[in-house]
Amino acid sequence: MIDKVFKEKADQSTDFRFDKKVVDVFDDMVVRSVPYYLEIQRMMVELANTFAKPNTNLYDLGCSTGTTMISMSKELDKSVGFVGIDESPQMLESCRNNLDANGVEQVVKLNSFDLNKGVEIENASVVILCLTLQFVRPLYRAKLIQSIYDQMNPGGAIILVEKVIGEGSDFNRKFIDYYYDYKRRNDYNDMEIAQKREALENILIPFKLSENIHMLEEAGFKDCETFFKWYNFTGLIAIK
């Protein structure tokens, strides 16, 4: 379905929620809103395939409609278990339907949980947060990353894809302008862009790239590398 969530003028702005209205159009929304989203997915599969060990688990925190796990299932060993976590029950329902429709052979467990409260991880060789940490309240992010590090298998990888803010205000403003131009090229009009920005204002709170790297290193992760960068979007991988 085509994303028309913000197509009509709203009487008043409300906070963005991953409800059924968003879930139904999410796949279109994310492809049109995140530069090189499908390439990011392909890159994450390559990276995960390097670190996902047989008979361990891959965690997808903020699994949404299951796109990442579906992509992973085609390349990863069938003995790698998948655990998808999302706070939205509607997302998890869509995720399960998509996993079944795509014939995913790995064992998949789906859980509804608020990452602001932490997460329980078992036998994990790969943990993915694709456009997820930015929705966790800043107060709880470092604690969540530390918890992931503490529970992961040694040698495991964390893959973090985030919207970020620029290190300096001048380029940050330019990058935001370029991003809005990108959305216009993908057929979002100015009203849609403005209304979504207002809805996300207190929900999606990006950090600087340097802040995300520091948070990973403070938790104990090493060999932190940037594998993707497009203006105000970035992908990081780090090893325990």
Where are the model-predicted features located?
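Conserved alpha-helix/loop element of class I SAM-dependent methyltransferases that forms part
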Residues: 36-54
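Class I SAM-dependent methyltransferase SAM/SAH-binding core
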Residues: 59, 68-117
